[in-house]
Design a protein with these regions (language model features):
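Expand to "…catalyze enediolate/carbanion chemistry for C-C bond making/breaking, isomerization
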Residues: 1-289
Length: 289
C-alpha cells in the first residue's frame, strides 16, 4: 500500500494507473497529509475524480479525517469505486461507530495511533473491538508517527529502526493483545524516506514479529520493502517439508529442529509470502489477513 495525499495534483493519473508506482493498492489520505482548510476541497475533488474513473487497476482506500468526514463521503463518494476506508486514531468507540455507519458493506482498516495503544487495558480493548467485526475489519495498522508524538513529542531517530526506539515496546505490546484475539497487524510506515538501508532492516524485524504488510509513503520505498519480503530458499524448503502430510512429528534439517505442530502456521505464512512475491513480481500486497 502506498499513501498519497488527496490534494496531489496528479491524483487522477495515479488512481487510473497511469503512474508506475509499483503497488497494487493506494491509500488516499484526507487526514494529516492534507491541510485542515483544504480537506473539504480535496474531498470534493476526489469524488469528481472517482466518478470519472472508468476502471481502477489498483485497490483504492480512503482515509477520512474523522467521523463527520466519513458521513460526507458515504453520501457523496462513489463507494463502488473504492475498497474501503482507513480509520485514523482508532478508539474502541470509533471502531464500532465506523462499522455501524458503513453497514458492514465496506472494509474498515483501523490505525492504532491513539493513547489507547499505549495502555495495556486499552490495547486489549482495541483488539477485542476489531475482533468483533470480521470480515469488515481484516486487520489493523500501527501508526508510528502519532505514537512517537504521544510518547513525549518524539520522532524516529536517524539511522535506527523503530524497534530501537520506545515505540518498539508499544508494538510488541500491541502484538500480544491482537494475536490473542486473532487479529493481524500491519507494520508502521517509516518517514525517513532517504534511509533505505534501515528501512530494509526494519522490514526484516517486522517479519520476525509476524507483521506482514508494510505501507510506503514514497514510491522510492516500495522496492526496498518488497525485496525484503522475499523468503530465503532454505526457509521455503523447510516450510514445505513441515507441511508435508507425512512429515515426522519432529525432524532435523540444516542444523535446525523442525516441529510441524509448532511451526505449521509459520510455514503456511512463509509459503503464502513466497507465492505472493513470485506471482506479483515487484508489486507488494496490502493484505492484512
Amino acid at each position: 500500500m502506498l499513501y498519497v495525499p488527496a490534494d496531489r495534483p496528479d491524483l487522477a493519473a495515479v488512481l487510473a494507473g497511469k503512474r508506475d508506482l509499483g503497488v497494487c493498492c493506494i491509500a488516499v489520505c484526507l487526514e494529516d497529509a492534507v491541510r485542515p482548510d483544504n480537506r473539504k476541497r480535496a474531498a470534493m475533488a476526489l469524488c469528481r475524480t472517482l466518478e470519472q474513473l472508468s476502471e481502477a487497476p489498483r485497490r483504492i482506500f480512503v482515509r477520512p479525517a474523522d467521523s463527520d468526514a466519513l458521513d460526507w463521503l458515504l453520501e457523496y463518494l462513489p463507494v463502488d469505486k473504492i475498497a474501503g476506508f482507513i480509520l485514523p486514531k482508532a478508539t474502541v468507540q470509533t471502531i464500532h461507530l465506523w462499522t455501524e455507519k458503513s453497514y458492514g458493506l465496506h472494509t474498515i482498516l483501523p490505525i492504532l495511533e491513539s493513547r489507547d495503544a499505549l495502555d495495556v487495558v486499552g490495547r486489549r480493548e482495541l483488539a477485542q473491538a476489531c475482533a468483533a467485526h470480521p470480515p469488515v475489519i481484516p486487520g489493523a495498522r500501527i501508526g508510528a508517527n502519532d505514537l512517537f508524538s504521544l510518547l513525549g513529542g518524539l520522532r524516529r531517530p536517524l539511522g535506527r529502526t523503530i524497534y530501537e526506539t520506545p515505540v518498539g515496546r508499544v508494538i510488541d505490546g500491541l502484538l500480544e493483545a491482537f494475536c490473542a484475539q486473532g487479529v493481524r497487524l500491519c507494520a508502521p510506515v517509516s518517514d525517513r524516506i532517504g534511509d533505505l538501508v534501515n528501512l530494509q532492516r526494519e522490514v526484516v524485524e517486522d517479519i520476525h514479529r509476524g507483521l506482514f504488510a508494510k505501507t510506503a509513503i514514497h514510491p522510492s520505498q516500495v522496492h526496498a520493502i518488497w525485496n525484503s519480503y522475499q523468503p530465503a530458499p532454505v526457509e521455503v524448503e523447510e516450510a514445505r517439508l513441515i507441511l508435508e502430510p507425512d512429515a515426522p512429528a519432529v525432524f532435523g534439517l540444516n542444523g535446525d529442529m523442525l516441529e510441524p505442530a509448532c511451526h505449521g502456521e509459520w510455514a503456511r505464512r512463509l509459503l503464502q509470502r513466497n507465492t505472493l512475491h513470485r506471482s506479483a513480481g515487484m508489486i507488494p500486497t496490502v493484505s492484512c489477513g
